Amino acid sequence: MAGRRYPIIAAALMMVIGVVSTVAADGGGIASLAAPATCWEQAARRYQVNPYLLVAIAEVESGLRPGAIGRNTNGSIDIGLMQINSLWLPELQRHGIAPRDLLDPCVSVHVGAWVLAQKMRLHGNTWTAVGAYNAGSAVLRERYARKVIEALARREQR
């Protein structure tokens, strides 16, 4: 099964490289999104994640809606542009971030980048890490990563 995943990962990686090249060539492409371009860029730089990957995650998570609230079957709540899960709140509150702060697009982008960086430290710079941003099980991680890849592809076509 592991051998089967490499072509998928290679194709997805080429797609991301194409998206980054295309967006960089058209002047950045993230300036008109739900948060100012500087928020995406600063968060990406601070947590060493790709800003276009952050945008794709936000698109999948909230449809780029800063005020989005999602309720989960386990009783947790997802808050804001990056749909930060309420299970993160105890840790965030230790850093002075309250639930209402997550409705601020810039705060949400920074926290989302921090969460993604945590997942990348755990799983490496992989699609598994991207999937872990949203899901715990391997099957759901893979499904979520595919959605993010599709969001990146849609952005490339714009």
Model-derived regions, located:
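Bacterial N-terminal signal peptides
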Residues: 10-19
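Domain-scale selection of a single, long terminal region
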Residues: 20-25
